[in-house]
Structures are given as C-alpha cells and as structure tokens.
Amino acid sequence: SGYDLAKDIGSGLAKAAVAIEVDGKQQDLHDSIEKDSTVSIITIDSEAGLEIMRHTLTAQVLARALKNIYPKSSLAIGPTIDNGFYYDIETNESISIDDLNRIENEMHKIIKTKSSITKKFKSKKEALSIFKSLNEPYKQIIINEAEQKEDFQLYYQDDDKFVAVSYTHLTLPTNGE
C-alpha cells in the first residue's frame, strides 16, 4: 500500500502521508499498488493533501456530525473551498449561528473516537440502494447523474451506519495506523 511504501521510506513521511498518486491518478493511502508504477506520496503540507484532509472533514466528520444532531436531514454536497469546506443539507429544523459551536463540538467528539474509515466499491445499482435505505435523495441524484462507468467509492465509518460517496479520502484502518 501507499502507507507501507511511505513507512519503508521513513516514519516521518508515513505520519505526514495522506494519499498517493499512482501513474498520475490520486488514490487512498491504504490502496494497494498492483504493478510497477510511478508513485508519489501526497503529504498533509501539500495543496493536494490539504484538500484531501478538508474533504475528509466535510464528507465524513461534518456530515456525520450533522446527521447526529439533525438525524432527519438530507445531505447534498460537501465540497472543499479555498479556505475550508462546507456541507449543503436540507432539514426541517432551523440552524442558527449559535448551533455552529454545537456542530463543531460534535465534530471534535467524532474525531476523538478515531473511527476507522474504509472504502468499498459498489455498483451504481448497489450505491443507489444504499442511499435509498439511508433516505438520502440528494446522494441518489448525484449517483444517477454520474456518467462514470466504474464502481462508486463509498466510504464507511466503523459502524457501517454512515456512508459518503466521494473521491480520495483519508482512510483509517481499524488498527489505527
């Protein structure tokens, strides 16, 4: 895996690594490197590494915090922007500026649990079924409108109750490395 490669080079690099680029394609740090390839290790201090970290915070941590606090909400998109990230959601409850501290505290609580984040590949049909069962209509729209031919990357936190569909994330195996 990219993590193993970084670890072989040095423990400092392994700690700073967030993803890899294999033959020009960004991949999760714990993905296998299947063949002889040109591999770059993406670190947290790079622009690409910062974007991956922000995307993980929005797609996994912020989204889960929002679902914990507003369980009947529907998640739309959670992109990164120049100086951070945000998440579009639909909820019947009002969210005020005062709620931001509560949301941030919930994010810190989620981070402290050190949940594992794993990637699973699912067909379009399977992904639609998963998001239908989670009552996530916007995720279903995103998947339906996607023109990709390959399977979708779905990211699960350890209890498999929270799923994000996305691109490269920080992945945390169950052993916490």
Sequence positions of predicted segments:
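Short, basic/aromatic beta-hairpin or loop at an interaction surface
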Residues: 10-19
